[in-house]
Each structure stands twice: as C-alpha cells, then as structure tokens.
Design a protein with these regions (language model features):
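Conserved alpha-helix/loop element of class I SAM-dependent methyltransferases that forms part
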Residues: 1-17
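Class I SAM-dependent methyltransferase SAM/SAH-binding core
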Residues: 28-72
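A short acidic, Gly/Pro-enriched loop at the edge of an enzyme's catalytic core
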Residues: 71-82
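A short SAM/SAH-binding and catalytic strip from SAM-dependent methyltransferases
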Residues: 82-94
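Short, glycine-/aromatic-enriched active-site segment of Class I SAM-dependent methyltransferases
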Residues: 116-134
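Short alpha-helix
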Residues: 135-149
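C-terminal helical/coil "lid" or tail adjacent to the Rossmann-like core of SAM-dependent
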Residues: 157-179
Length: 179
C-alpha cells in the first residue's frame, strides 16, 4: 500500500512504540495517523499549510499537529528520536536550513527517515506543470545537504515501485504526459 516503504523503514529503524516521532510535511495528516495506527504513541505532524493542519486535526483528533515551517521548528533541541518525511523534503525552499533544524530537534542517536523523489543528475530539476517535483535534487545533492547539517551517517537506497505509481498519478492529474 501507500505506506509500505515507510513501514519497512520503521522496521529497520527499530523505534520503540513510545519514541517521540515527528513527521515533517504531514499535509492533512495521513502519514502521522498511519504511524499512530501502527502503535506509535507519541507522534507529532508538522506542516507549513495552516489549512492542511486544520484538516488533519479534524480528521485525526488523537494525533498532535502543529503548523510550522520546517526551517524553524518550534521544538526544543533533542525532542524527537525520529523524523519522518514522506515526499515533502524536495518541496522545501531552504533545504539546508531545514536539514539543520532536523539535526537540532533530533535526540542524540536519532534518525531521520526521508522518502522522496530524486533526480538522476546534479542540476536544477523541475517538471513543468507538477509543482511537487520542483526542487527535486539528486541523491548526491540530498546527501551533501544532510552531511553539511551534521548528520553523521547518511544512507540511501533507490526504491521505484511506489513512486512510479505516484509519478504516473501526478502526471495524469496535471496533464503532463510521461517522457
């Protein structure tokens, strides 16, 4: 399903069910709610879009949602054992600032799990007509951002199954033919 890659990453991360987890770019809260459904009891979703946060709060009253900018998270240093971001980091303006904030709010030994689109090469990447693909970087570009923010170990893998379906749906929704 939609959250299969997230579930696999959570399994590998071995977070305790009571670990404080932050989903950055939660939109209307489905990912954060899914974490709660999996038994994680201390989940906070954050998004810059106040309307999306209002919808998330209405749909999932048992989960905490905060309207905030990923570059200026309103949490104390070391507040979270894990940060999750599902197809959201690529659309953040100021990725370096956001990555530094991720590092700041993570507890020592904490993990950031990002699932996002990546470009094949180093250059500015946009897909005319599909806003959520603006700002996509290569894997090397993302790695450089997180290493510069102080992350000690940056692991990456390429998974296509779930994202091919998403990309096809986006293309169809925005009237952009596959190339």
């Amino acid at each position: 399903g939609r959250f299969k890659l997230l579930e696999l990453s959570l399994e590998a991360a071995c977070f305790a069910k009571a670990a404080p987890l932050l989903e950055v770019g939660c939109a209307t809260g489905e990912g954060s709610a899914h974490l709660a459904e999996l038994g994680y009891t201390c989940v906070t979703g954050v998004d810059i879009d106040a309307e999306a946060i209002a919808q998330a709060r209405e749909k999932f009253p048992g989960v905490s949602f905060v309207c905030a900018d990923a570059r200026h998270l309103p949490f104390a240093a070391g507040s979270f054992e894990g940060i999750i971001s599902e197809a959201a980091f690529s659309v953040i303006d100021g990725k370096a600032e956001a990555a530094r904030e991720y590092a700041r709010v993570l507890a020592p030994g904490g993990l950031a799990l990002l699932h996002d689109f990546a470009a094949a090469a180093e250059s500015a990447h946009t897909q005319p007509g599909i806003p959520c693909l603006d700002g996509v970087q290569s894997m090397a570009g993302y790695r450089a951002v997180f290493e510069a923010a102080g992350f000690e170990r940056v692991c990456e893998s390429e998974e296509y199954g779930e994202y091919i379906g998403i990309a096809m749906s986006l293309g169809k929704a925005y009237g952009v033919p596959p190339t």
